[in-house]
């Protein structure tokens, strides 16, 4: 893969930034694509733009505002509370989001001569999102190849690792402090360690605390 090109689906969050660093190490050339779907915090897009600029990565922002029109949710509507009732999908789930993002990333990838697509979806910290499952990604990979007659390969470096292991991967890639300080995971739009209260921040912090304990234990 060292001689090939990849497109990374990039939000500016912890997971996709870790995947961006992973792709930079794995591929000869990397581009990033970010989707503007009228997310709750425009800072998310600004964050992605700044990270790509700092890393010298060619970056495309695509207008996907129609997604909010089709599937209103707590990620795009400030009047909707972020909730997750047992047995139901979280209010942050956006129907069709990863299906559309990966499909448009594939169109872009083919246009720029890349066959590798990298995404940070993960089953281990599964939040009930059906489009984060490995079976979905594998199925879509086949569908995209057939639909465009092109040998795409969708890579999911985080699929089988939890948040602590994601922090470990960023550390192994030499990007731990960068990811911790410059990414935006928080649903309330606070860069870095975030608000500490929303579900995304709690998951991120729990993983970070676990990894730091493991790293400290290994060094003793």
Swiss-Prot record:
Positions bound to ATP: 10-20
Catalytic activity of the protein: 7-carboxy-7-deazaguanine + NH4(+) + ATP = 7-cyano-7-deazaguanine + ADP + phosphate + H2O + H(+)
Example GO molecular function: ligase activity, forming carbon-nitrogen bonds
Entry-linked InterPro entries: QueC (IPR018317), Rossmann-like_a/b/a_fold (IPR014729)
One Pfam family of this chain: QueC
Biological source species: Bacillus anthracis
Gene: queC
Keyword Ligase: yes
Species lineage: Bacteria, Bacillati, Bacillota, Bacilli, Bacillales
Cofactor(s) the protein requires to work: Zn(2+)
Record flagged with keyword Transmembrane: no
Identification of the protein by name: 7-cyano-7-deazaguanine synthase
């Amino acid at each position: 893969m060292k001689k090939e090109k990849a497109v990374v689906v990039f939000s500016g969050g912890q997971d996709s930034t870790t995947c961006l660093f992973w792709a930079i190490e794995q591929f000869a050339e990397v581009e990033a694509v970010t989707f503007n779907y009228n997310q709750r915090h425009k800072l998310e897009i600004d964050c992605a733009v700044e990270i790509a600029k700092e890393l010298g990565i060619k970056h495309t922002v695509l207008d996907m505002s129609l997604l909010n029109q089709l599937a209103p949710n707590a990620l795009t509507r400030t009047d909707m509370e972020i909730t997750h009732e047992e047995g139901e999908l979280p209010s942050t789930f956006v129907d069709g989001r990863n299906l559309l993002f990966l499909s448009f990333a594939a169109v872009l990838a083919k246009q720029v001569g890349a066959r590798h697509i990298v995404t940070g979806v993960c089953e281990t910290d599964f939040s009930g999102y059906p489009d984060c499952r490995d079976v979905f990604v594998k199925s879509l990979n086949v569908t995209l190849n057939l639909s465009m007659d092109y040998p795409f390969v969708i890579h999911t470096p985080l699929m089988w690792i939890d948040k602590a292991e994601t922090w470990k991967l960023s550390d192994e890639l030499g990007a731990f402090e960068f990811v911790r300080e410059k990414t935006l995971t928080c649903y309330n739009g606070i860069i870095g360690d975030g608000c500490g209260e929303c579900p995304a921040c709690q998951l991120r912090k729990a993983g970070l605390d676990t990894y730091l304990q493991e790293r400290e234990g290994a060094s003793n």
